[in-house]
């Protein structure tokens, strides 16, 4: 991983691992993808809202981040990442 983080979540999609959000000293919006075939990490599109401790699930080819905490308040929002569109 390129960024140290805790309280993040991980989901698998198309054979890659996606590490989503979390905290360093602040809540994070960054998302990193690990490809075990090439043993390489890449940054992909960031979350709109920084969050850690979120629920995460892969459904119908997209990764959904649900709730979590942004460092100031608990969140009741949902974001979806589409790897084909990288957003």
Task: Identify what each model region corresponds to.
Residues 1-87:
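Kelch-like beta-propeller repeat domains
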């Amino acid at each position: 991983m390129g960024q140290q983080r805790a309280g993040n979540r991980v989901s698998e999609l198309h054979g890659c691992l996606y590490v989503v959000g979390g905290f360093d000293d602040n809540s994070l919006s960054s998302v990193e993808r690990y490809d075990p075939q090439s043993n390489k990490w890449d940054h992909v599109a960031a979350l709109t809202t920084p969050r850690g401790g979120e629920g995460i699930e892969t459904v119908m080819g997209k990764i959904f981040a649900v709730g979590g905490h942004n460092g100031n308040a608990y969140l009741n929002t949902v974001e979806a990442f589409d790897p084909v569109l990288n957003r």
